[in-house]
Amino acid sequence: IEMAAAVGAPASEVPQNMYPISIPYVSGSPEFAQAPDTTTVNGDEVEITTAKGNSKTVQVVVPAYFRDYQSLAWNVASFDKSFNPAATGAILLKEVMWSQDFLGGMHVTETDEEVEADSAKMDQDGKHSLGVSAADGFNGMMLTEMSIDKLQIMQEQLGFNGKELGVKFGPDYNPANGAIWFAHKVAVEEGSESGVKSIKGLKVTDATSSLRDTWQMLWPVGEFFAFTDQRTANSAQNPAFSAVFDGAPFAAAPNANTDSVDSNDVVATDAFSLANNISNLLFQNMAALHYNQKQGTFVTEYQQGTQGNRVDVYDASYSMAALSIYQRAKDALPVGYASAESSDVNLKSESGKKALSMIKGQADFILTNLIGKNGLVFDGMTIDKSMTRDASQSVDAQFAAIRGLVAAFLATDDVKYKQAARSIYLAVEKNMFDKNINTWSAKPGQATIHTPYTSAAISAGLREAMLHLKNEEGENEPALELTALTDRYVSWFRGVINGGMQLSEWMGDSGENQIKGSSSTDTDEDGVHQVIAAGGKFGTAMTMANKVSVK
C-alpha cells in the first residue's frame, strides 16, 4: 500500500495474491500445479494487429487469473531447492533493467502524464509521483524491493570462505586477506514465517567459485549500483532515481558511503550500500580468483584455494561485458541501454582503471589465441604447456565473443576489437548460416541445441552488430548492412524464440488477448500460446525453455 501511494497508484488495482520472489531456486518446472481461474471478471473493446498484419476491433474478456495470481502457482515438487549465484544474477539483471525504465521519470499524479524529473524533491510537491506512470511506477517499486531482498540475503547469509557459510564481509574486502565468495550451489531447508516461505537452513553442496556465477552477479549489481548511486561526486545522477532512495519509500545510504572517500565505507542494508559492498567483493574476486594475470585471461573456476586453468570463451566474453558495466557505474558513466554514451562526469576511479585493464587483457587474449583459420572462435582452451584449444566452435561462443569484443571496443576506444567482432560475424555468416532454417547452426544441415544462453548471446551479439558493427561510410560488406542484420534478427526470433523457445505468452502488453466468443489461444498469431494452453496438465508459465533443438 505504501509503494502504491508513492507512485500514485490505487491500492485496489494491485493484483491479488502476489508472491514476490526474494531469491530464486536454481530450477523448476513452470507447469502450473492447478487449473488457472478463467472466470471472466471484466471486458473491453480493443483494436489489435496480429503478427501476420491482420487488424481488427475485438471484444476481449479478462479472466480472473489476470488480476488474482492465486491459481498460478508452479509445481513445487519439481523444484531444485538450491541457490545459485548465476540464477540469482539473471533475474536480478531483469529486475534492475526494468526498474530503471519504470522509475526513470515521474508523472503527474492526477493525469498520469509522464514528465522528466527536474529535481529529487519533485515527488513531494503534491502534484507529481514517482515512476513514469502509476502502473509502471508500482512495478518498479516491487522489482526494486525484490532486488534489495536478494542482495540482503547474499550479504548476510551467503558469504563463503571455503569452510563456513554466512561469513561477513565489508567494503574493505581484499581476497589477499582471505577469499570470500558465493558458492556455486547452496541447498535450502525451507521454513515458514508469517504465512510465507522462509530460509530455515542452508548447506553448501558445491563450494566452487564459478566465473559464470561471478560475472552474472557483477553485471546486475553494477547496474544496481548506478541505479541507486547517491555519491555526492555523481552530479549526473537522474533526479528521479535519487527521489526513490531519499528515505521514502526506500532508505537513503549513510553519509560515509556517499562521500568522496572510499576507505571509510561501511556495511549497511540500504540499496546503495548493498550494491557498493557486494559489487566490490565480486570485482575483487574477478581480479584475484578468476583472472590469470600472466596470461591475461579469465578462468572458469577457483577451487580449494587454487585458480583453475580452463578458459571458456562465452564466460570470458561476458566477463568483459560485466566489467564494462561495473567500470561505468564506478566512474558515474551511463549504464543500461545508455552504456555506449558519454557523460560530463567521469570519476576515473582506481577500480574502473583496473577493470579496463582486465577488459583489454581478455580481448587481446581472445584475438591472439582463440580465433581459428576459418575466422570463428574456439569454445575455449586449457592453459597448459601446449595451450590446448577446444576443437568445437559453437554458435554460443561466436555471438558471445562479438558481444564481449564490442564491449571492449566501447570501453577502450580501440578499433581493433570492433574490426575483430565484424570479422567474426562475417565468418559466422559464411560458415554457420543454414538456409533451410533461415538462421545459424553449428553445423548447417544438422540440428543445433539452443539454450537460453544461446538465445542471450545471439540477441546481444546482433544488437551490438546493429548498433556498432554495421557498415559506415566506406564500408560495404553486404552482411553488415543494417537491413541485412535486421532481417537476420527477425528470422532468428520468429524461427527459434517464437518457434519453440518461448513456452507461453501472458496477456495484455504482449499483444495476446482472450477474445469473447473465440477459442483461439494465439490471438496475435505469433505462434506462442496463452499460458492456459501451452502444455502441461494445467498450462505453463511464460518462461523460456531450458533447451530446444533447431533443425
Segments (PLM) and residue ranges:
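Glycan-recognition and catalytic cores of secretory/periplasmic carbohydrate-active enzymes
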Residues: 1-551
